[in-house]
């Protein structure tokens, strides 16, 4: 990734260029009642290029693919050239290199989608086992993002951001009386953070009617 970004920055004709990029891996499993509604894995890439021409101004280009990144840099440069404004001088800032990584006890990227499905299915079944609960919505999701920032002055920063979540929603009914409740958990940790959380489902199942 660093080589791709560096190559795009090197191709820039602007006085100053910066690229912010995010690559996000995500998985999601959703139950609605007893029906498995969603089970998928996605990988997304996107970001923004900012270019400065000192005798013009700032130009911006966005992207959602690494293909053609150099073209997006050129587009930002052309936008900057088209801007009419006062000359701009940036304050001198020494280049920074940093890499912020995380160590997950149980990296959810190494857990199969079927195991994630079994986990949220188990919590959903706890809710459905109670007679008064008529409908449920149970969601497992995780995301692992890598955030990159680089500029033409030599700064390069990479940061990892994990997030794992479960959301449980239940609707209980007794006659005309309907109550809805939910429990949720979202933490910047690994798969272990959402294992053994049966108490969330049990607590939610005690909706007072």
Q: How should these model regions be labeled?
A:
Residues 1-207:
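Active-site bordering "gate/hinge" segments
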């Amino acid at each position: 990734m660093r080589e791709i970004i560096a190559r795009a920055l090197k191709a820039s004709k602007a006085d100053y260029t910066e690229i912010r990029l995010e690559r996000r891996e995500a998985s999601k499993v959703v139950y609605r009642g007893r029906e498995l509604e969603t089970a998928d894995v996605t990988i997304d890439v996107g970001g923004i290029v900012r270019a400065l021409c000192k005798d013009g101004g700032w130009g911006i280009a966005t992207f959602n693919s690494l293909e053609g990144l150099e073209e997006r840099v050129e587009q930002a440069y052309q936008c900057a050239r088209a801007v009419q404004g006062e000359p701009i001088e940036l304050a001198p800032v020494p280049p920074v290199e940093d890499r912020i990584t995380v160590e997950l006890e149980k990296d959810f990227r190494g857990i199969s989608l079927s195991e994630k499905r079994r986990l949220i299915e188990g919590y959903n079944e706890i809710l459905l086992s109670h007679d008064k609960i008529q409908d449920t919505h149970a969601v497992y999701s995780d995301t692992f993002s890598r955030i990159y920032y680089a500029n033409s002055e030599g700064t390069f920063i990479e940061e990892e951001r994990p997030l794992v979540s479960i959301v449980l929603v239940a609707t209980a009914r007794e006659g005309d009386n309907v109550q809805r409740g939910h429990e949720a958990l979202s933490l910047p940790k690994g798969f272990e953070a959402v294992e053994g959380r049966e108490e969330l489902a049990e607590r939610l199942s005690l909706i007072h009617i």
